[in-house]
Amino acid sequence: MLKWTSNTFKDILELKDGPVTYSDSGRGNLKMSNHPYPYSIKEEEFNFLRNLIVEHNLQRGYECATAFGISSTALGLGFKETGGKIVTMDAYIEESKGNPGHYRDMQREVYDKADGYKSVKYLIEQFGLENTLFPEIGWSPDDTETCIRRHFSEPLDFVFIDAGHFPEQMIKDIDAFLPLLGEKYVLAFHDVYPQSFSEAVHTTCLKRLARKLRLNFHIHLVKI
């Protein structure tokens, strides 16, 4: 069984006996060798997310979206250390369509034969996360609460959003998890570009969280 080290990201790249193999995108991300998309988070982000969970002793998390389980594994390793649990959900449309923006105008659709789902299940086995990381196939916002409640009923204290990089989807994702949050929590958003984390998203956060977010780098945190 693999364990977390400072080289875990590279260890994943070298795995060759699973349902998929992994390759470097050339930009510091990993990808499944037989698919153009999706891309994973980068190594420094992987370690950052794992350490974030441990440093704050977080217990119940939700990730949207899984992709093929690299960020999920980072989070799972953190929650394994704290004794917590995390649900990760994806519809796997980016993989099935080979296009990260294809589902912008789609209605609810899920792809239940995804290599990404097979990949995250494989990584769970490799890192001994069977009691920590729970992958679900679902569409945000429609299936968010149902998928989370299959695994725990207590409030969330962590959410990581790395799904549709366009304002209307980010607002839907935020509205889906807000009712499930506890009093204190940490939120993390990936790829917070101006065109995706727009003024409309800022306004939504201001109304729902009573604060406007200040963004920097690629992962933005909200700690409450």
What kind of feature is each model-predicted range?
Residues 1, 16-23, 208, 213:
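Short, flexible helical or helix-coil boundary motifs
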Residues 1-14:
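N-terminal auxiliary segments of SAM/dcSAM-dependent transferases
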Residues 3, 16, 31-33, 152, ...:
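Generic detection of intrinsically disordered/low-complexity segments and helix-coil linkers/edges
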Residues 8-11, 26, 205:
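Terminal low-complexity, poorly structured segments
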Residues 12, 18, 25, 132, ...:
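Short linear motifs in intrinsically disordered/low-complexity regions
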Residues 13-56:
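Class I SAM-dependent methyltransferase Rossmann-like catalytic core
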Residues 35, 46-224:
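S-adenosylmethionine/decaboxylated-SAM
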